[in-house]
Each structure stands twice: as C-alpha cells, then as structure tokens.
C-alpha cells in the first residue's frame, strides 16, 4: 500500500502562504475567496530549494490563473509550462506574466496522447510537475504514467486534491506497474485550522519522486 503522512500546518506560516493569499489561490489556507487548501506550508517544505535557483516547472490545470502568478513570484529563476483544456484560461493567464519564461498550451488529461504531445513542448528534464486539473482518479493515473519520461531523476510529481473518500488502494492498484520508477511515494493529508473544502473533502496530496 502507499504510505500516508499527515501534516497540520496551523502553526506554520510561510512566504508562500502569504503569496497565496495575495493572489487569491485556493492552495493557501489564508485565501479569502472560496476554498482554502492547506498546501502552501507543505509546498514550502518540498520546494524551498528552488526558490532562488533555476527550476523547470509544470502545472496542469490553471483555471483563473491565480497560481500562474503565484509560481512566477515564488520561483525567481523559473522556466514555466502551464497547461489547461480551456484556451480562454490560457490566454487570460498569458497576459499577466512574461512570455520569455512562460509557455501556455492546451492539454486534455483524459487522453494519454494529448498529455504526451503537450509535454513534448517542455523538452523534458522537468524538476517539478503539479497537477491541479480534473481531480479525477483515472485522469490522475493517466498523468502519472505519461509524465514519467519527461521528469528528471530526482524530479517530483505532485497530484493535488486527492479525494479523502477515495480508497487509497485505488491508487496503489493503478500505480503498481510503475511503482519501481520512484524512490518515494506517499500521500500527504493536509490539515489546518482554516481548512475549507465543502462538498469536496479533498485536502490531500500524492507526492512521487522519480529515481
């Protein structure tokens, strides 16, 4: 089975937490609009090594574009690739950041070929890939399987918004054929006094580090 870690970040406030509040992203428990996932303190723990260093960063699923601004502000030397199934989301976000280090392209996470073809635009050697797209377990499984060749050794995949109601065995069964590709795999159940995700109950991550 896939191990699980629970992190309560109520007493841990980071720069990324505040940036999440500033840009109104639901990744921060201090977001003032809509859902409040307690991810930003955990992300600081996982990503701080890249804050002042070059990073090749991919996010799948950008919706209104709050996280596009967040990552551009946090990673000072980042090269970014953002994907979504909605061209309007991509066009809107592209207006808010530099075209020099940001690439936007369509991707349909329900189709393996679309995932592969879109990721080919990155040139591979991805340091960190974050999925915030459909939150569908089948699609999340497709993403993990298809992104492996594009992730560098030691690179990280983070799947956001795993349903706490979904049996963890579901993910183990989907990933057991590629489990050997990773040096670390774990769920992270994220807790915070401000946690708020009514109707979803999906404050949970799946983190995978490639061998």
Regions found by a protein language model. Name each.
Residues 1-130, 134-159, 163-211:
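A short alpha-helical cap/connector motif
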């Amino acid at each position: 089975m896939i191990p699980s870690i629970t992190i309560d970040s109520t007493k841990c406030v980071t720069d990324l937490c505040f940036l999440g509040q500033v840009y109104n992203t639901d990744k921060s428990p201090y977001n003032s609009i809509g859902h409040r996932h307690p991810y930003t303190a955990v992300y600081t723990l996982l990503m701080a090594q890249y804050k002042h260093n070059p990073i090749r960063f991919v996010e799948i699923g950008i919706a209104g574009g709050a996280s596009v601004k967040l990552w551009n502000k946090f990673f000072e030397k980042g090269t970014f690739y953002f994907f979504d199934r909605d061209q309007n989301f991509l066009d809107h976000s592209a207006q808010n950041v530099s075209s020099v280090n940001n690439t936007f392209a369509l991707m349909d996470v329900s189709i393996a070929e679309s995932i592969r073809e879109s990721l080919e635009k990155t040139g591979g050697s991805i340091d960190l890939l974050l999925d915030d797209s459909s939150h569908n377990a089948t699609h999340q499984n497709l993403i993990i399987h298809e992104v492996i060749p594009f992730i560098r050794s030691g690179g990280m995949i983070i799947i956001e918004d795993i349903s706490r109601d979904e049996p963890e065995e579901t993910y183990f069964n989907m990933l057991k054929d590629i489990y050997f590709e990773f040096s670390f795999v774990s769920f992270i159940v994220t807790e915070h006094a401000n946690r708020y995700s009514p109707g979803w109950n999906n404050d949970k991550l799946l983190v995978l580090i490639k061998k």
